UniProtKB/Swiss-Prot annotation:
It comes from Mus musculus (Mouse). It is found in: Membrane. The chain crosses the membrane at residues 5-25, 35-55, 78-98, 110-130. PANTHER family: FAM11A, B PROTEIN, TRANSMEMBRANE PROTEIN 60. It is a multi-pass membrane protein. This is Transmembrane protein 60. Its main location: membrane.
Length: 133
């Protein structure tokens, strides 16, 4: 399951464009859709990314894999998996708040996003200041 760079870029643009069109229609009150329906392109894109990531992580379980090459690679892929799950949690909490399924405080909705941003800043700082190849 390997995608070329052009395919990934095209897929990203397609799902982003579809999501933004649906979002504009919802915000202009032209479409009376549920917020969960608005986020379907985002979730389809995230599902594709999660499947690709899990396949790459499962490739490490092959019998011919040499663990000396890329031991830090599994940590990076685990961070990507955690980041995707945090993004999914934020999207679900945001949709639940916008649909008024819950009376959760808005600051609680943003906790997964804040954790994701803090982790991204930590990884960026680590890659800038501590990784020297």
């Amino acid at each position: 399951m390997r995608m070329s760079l052009a395919q990934r870029v095209l897929l990203t643009w397609l799902f982003t464009l579809l999501f933004l069109i649906m979002l504009v229609l919802k915000l202009d009150e032209k479409a009376p859709w549920n917020w969960f329906l608005i986020f379907i392109p985002v979730w389809i894109f995230d599902t594709i990314l999660l499947v690709m990531l899990i396949v790459k992580m499962a490739g490490r379980c092959k019998s011919g894999f040499d663990p000396r090459h890329g031991s830090h690679n599994i940590k990076k892929k685990a961070w990507y998996l955690i980041a995707m799950l945090l993004k999914l949690a934020f999207c679900l909490a945001l949709c639940a708040k916008l649909e008024q399924f819950t009376t959760m405080n808005l600051s609680y909705v943003f906790i997964p996003l804040w954790a994701l941003l803090a982790g991204a800043l930590t990884e960026l700082g680590y890659n800038v200041f501590f990784v020297r190849d």
